[in-house]
Amino acid sequence: ALTKDGVEYFAYGGGGGMNENNIEKVKNKNKRKSANILWSADSRHFAMLRVDQRNVKELWVINSIADPRPTLETYKYQMPGEKEAPVEHLLIFNMADKTNKELSVKQFKDQNIGLWSAPALKSGRDDDWRPSLWHGTNGKLYFTRTSRDLKRIDICMVDINSGTVKP
């Protein structure tokens, strides 16, 4: 295993059970979840976002037209005005030595980070499987960081070896 310290609402690369009602969440609790990662072209590294939602309050949604009975969906969601926000961490994993490091990309309070994936090749559009590659080179990747109020978006490039971020 590459990691052993993931906990609920601060897991590695997963979606946290979004779009599952509470019955499905309990039923799928022990099933393996996919990790949302992007690989370097040489497959020596991969990047992922780890989101800490442990302090974010829960939101409850009732699906009143579910059949045969209404269902409840519960997930973490920051409502306007609440101080508890999800905290996103950008991690790079090195497959050769099975280590990971967090890159310092913080610029805005309660920012969102978006990793850029490489454009899909037209020749692969009909393939059953397409690799998830990051946009950039083997040693550099591109991402965006967006302020909570959406008034500022930085397009950034990060050198994964030095950790240097250039907006």
Say what each PLM segment does:
Residues 2-38, 45-110:
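Predominantly five- to eight-bladed beta-propeller fold
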Residues 53-56, 147-151:
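Short glycine/acidic-enriched loop and turn motifs that connect beta-strands
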Residues 94, 156-159:
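Structural recognition of the beta-propeller blade-terminating site
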Residues 88, 98, 153-155, 163:
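Repetitive beta-architecture junctions, highlighting loop-to-beta-strand starts
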Residues 24-26, 101-103, 118-122, 166-167:
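A short beta-strand motif characteristic of beta-propeller blades
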